[in-house]
């Protein structure tokens, strides 16, 4: 089968985009440069804030996202991934305007939970307030019989502070401190009955790892990267 070219619609944020590409590289079964997949990246950090658009009637990111998808298609991509969970709120609207298929991060994470940990029926979801409030991730999980626990308002504000601090090149606190806050939120979700934790924002896996948690950790960014490798025609490294 002819390998497909991956298009990454990135910049939301830039470090998450870099991490996504790094995970594609590290999970590709390649022994030489030539055995790696072709990847085209449009990293545009000028995309309007997705959470502001979802919960506060901010500027819609859709026109910029559609333009990015079209640029990727013009450059030769066969399909697109978006390493930003909040941007998936607009996925249907974007998909209606472009011909290339876009992998849904909601779908690939849900499928991974079912295939790898079928016994898990309750998960904790950590993400932006936009992702949590729109409820699309929760609905996708519910269709497959998986219940979702989310943080209360106080804990959710800590998640948002952590996400924006990760995006900040010069944050006022260390990443160790950021990790500590996110671990506390995750532990709170576990105490509410979560048997797994979803990193439902692509910044979160930059600081929160499986070693920090007592339950299975579903890193949406890694799952998306691996799904992209598979769709491109290769089997990712286990």
Regions found by a protein language model. Name each.
Residues 1-238:
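Non-catalytic structural scaffold of enzyme domains
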């Amino acid at each position: 089968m002819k390998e497909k070219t991956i298009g990454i619609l990135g910049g939301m944020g830039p470090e998450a985009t870099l991490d996504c590409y790094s995970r594609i590289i590290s999970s590709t079964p390649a022994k030489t440069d030539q055995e790696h997949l072709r990847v085209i990246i449009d990293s545009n950090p000028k995309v309007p804030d997705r959470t502001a658009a979802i919960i506060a009637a901010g500027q819609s990111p859709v026109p910029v996202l559609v333009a990015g998808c079209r640029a990727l298609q013009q450059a030769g991509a066969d399909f697109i991934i978006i390493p930003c969970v909040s941007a998936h709120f607009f996925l249907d609207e974007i998909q209606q305007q472009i011909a290339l298929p876009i992998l849904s991060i909601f779908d690939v994470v849900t499928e991974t939970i079912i295939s790898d940990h079928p016994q898990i029926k309750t998960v904790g979801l950590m993400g932006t307030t936009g992702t949590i409030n729109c409820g699309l991730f929760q609905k996708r999980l519910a269709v497959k019989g998986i219940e979702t626990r989310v943080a209360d308002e106080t804990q959710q504000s800590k998640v948002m502070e952590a996400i924006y601090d990760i995006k900040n090149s010069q944050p006022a606190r260390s990443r160790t401190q950021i990790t500590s806050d996110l671990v506390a939120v995750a532990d709170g979700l576990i105490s509410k009955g979560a048997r797994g934790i979803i990193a439902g924002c692509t910044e979160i896996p930059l600081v929160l790892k499986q070693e920090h948690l007592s339950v299975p950790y579903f890193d949406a960014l890694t799952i998306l990267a691996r799904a992209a490798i598979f769709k491109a025609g290769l089997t990712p490294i286990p």
